[in-house]
């Protein structure tokens, strides 16, 4: 039996989960069709998903149709969970991209399609909700060709809310023959030579073109009324082909972790090559660590079943493997889809329990959520001791807050959400703190040079000190101190895009330790940073704005107000296409504004493109002034228990 792994993708409220539930029901995997409104869906299994009617975590189920086993991965539709969607792309053989016939193409739709196109993932476009009042399919077809691709093949016509095929193994419209010829040289040569070409020949060529992601078939339906679902199943089993196995050696990729109500850990793996068997002893990540497979399940017709073996391209589930982490692999390192650019969160907030004694409980719960979703980043601020979480958006914050309360029984409060800025030194500086020169309490001399690097370079660390004079353990301690120092600059944000050179060192052999160098480094670094000053960097987005020509003047005015950098404008009689860069902070709500003033016709698509020096206002990420921070570091070291906040002290260390 052929096995394929299919992603179901869509913008929010396009009916993605409803389509998935109908696929399960129509294929016989379930006895009734789950409804989002009723909270009885199979794929949205979390209580919060059922209650809010949105998908938070990618879920996997399975159907069989026309002799093909299809593992369906239902992904979140909200931008706040884009990291979950990106992980899914790595394991797909194909995708169904769902559009709402009423709302049309949204910014998320285009972002998803562009990624599918870039990664050359075979994709079927399914226009859902054709039963809705006010649907204008002709306008949507034009929108698809304008904003997604010209290489689409409309497989059906819609009459009175029902779908009828116009392209199949037995029949193909004349204009579609020309379409196929324009995309395949072999068919074109036969066509020009007046050779006989049957509908089946055209059909097989279309299958090949779809498999190569050169053509995108478009189907129609209504999940609400089970219209077009069987036709979609036929298209999936025809157009999405399984990859060829290249080896019999085990290669498996861990893409999902979940915990059951009793806390047992389930790890989901895609078997890339070979097979995984019960009681196998397998290697993790080419390391020296081996595990024994003590239990093994797969998904069959919507149910998890115990098996002795899971073969290539299928999904395996292993329970209670505590060492597993998302992204791990078993056996040979797999060749996964490349080219994904991970999007980092641009927001952060402090979180605290309503009851202070439950802080450790919150940290434990967040660690569990991090195991299930590695994009969830949290840390303890080394200065304020606050627990901070990085976020993609407000919806993610609300989901985390609800999960902590309902799943882990701990109520928390989130402080104001801030944009994540960064800092970079303004100029090259050098700073030295000498051994035995008060108030230096450490048996160490350290000199550091800081110099700015081009944006996007990151942190570079070099040493001018020979290992013959100062051995590895001492120098590594300095490097650790530098990395720690970069976590919080003068305004409390990460310091990046700089080179730090370890330029001077002195120690006393009987008493100096690596700890002296590790603990002194942050003081030297901070004083150097104060001497240099910093540029504040803000997150930037690359944008593409597609709007009707009549709205172009307003759009350009808006973009100027948002301090964008317009790189290209191209217009025709009907549409205007604008590209450029815009600060995240000024544009985070603009997609909904575009939809409003263009009456749903405009699309504002964005993706992260790094940081640049801010042109507008910014917020600090600190709770104490800078001199207090230096004092705080000395006191925290436990070397100086009490130190007077005297001007002489600050003068001495500066």
UniProtKB/Swiss-Prot annotation:
Q: Name one Pfam family in it.
A: EF-G_D2
Q: A single Gene Ontology molecular function, please?
A: GTPase activity
Q: Which UniProt keywords apply?
A: Antibiotic resistance, GTP-binding, Nucleotide-binding, Protein biosynthesis
Entry's Gene Ontology BP terms: response to antibiotic; ribosome disassembly; translation
Q: Where does GTP bind?
A: 10-17, 74-78, 128-131
Question: Do you know which InterPro entries this protein is assigned to?
Answer: EF-G-like_DII, EFG_II, EFG_III/V, EFG_V-like, G_TR_CS, P-loop_NTPase, Ribosomal_Su5_D2-typ_SF, Ribsml_uS5_D2-typ_fold_subgr
Please verify whether the record's keywords include GTP-binding. yes
**Which CDD domains does the protein's record reference?**
Tet_C, Tet_II, Tet_III, Tet_like_IV, TetM_like
Annotated tr-type G domain residues? 1-244
- Which SUPFAM superfamilies does this UniProt record tie to the protein? EF-G C-terminal domain-like (SSF54980), P-loop containing nucleoside triphosphate hydrolases (SSF52540), Ribosomal protein S5 domain 2-like (SSF54211), Translation proteins (SSF50447)
**Which PROSITE patterns does the entry mention?**
G_TR_1, G_TR_2
Respond yes or no to whether keyword Transferase is given for this record: no
Q: Could you tell me which PANTHER family the record lists for this protein?
A: RIBOSOME-RELEASING FACTOR 2, MITOCHONDRIAL (PTHR43261:SF1), TRANSLATION ELONGATION FACTOR G-RELATED (PTHR43261)
Q: Which family does it belong to?
A: Belongs to the TRAFAC class translation factor GTPase superfamily. Classic translation factor GTPase family. TetM/TetO subfamily.
Concerning NCBIfam families, the annotation shows: small_GTP, tet_protect, tet_protect_Q
- What biological function has been recorded for the protein in this entry? Abolishes the inhibitory effect of tetracyclin on protein synthesis by a non-covalent modification of the ribosomes.
State what protein this is by name: Tetracycline resistance protein TetQ
Gene symbol of the encoding locus: tetQ
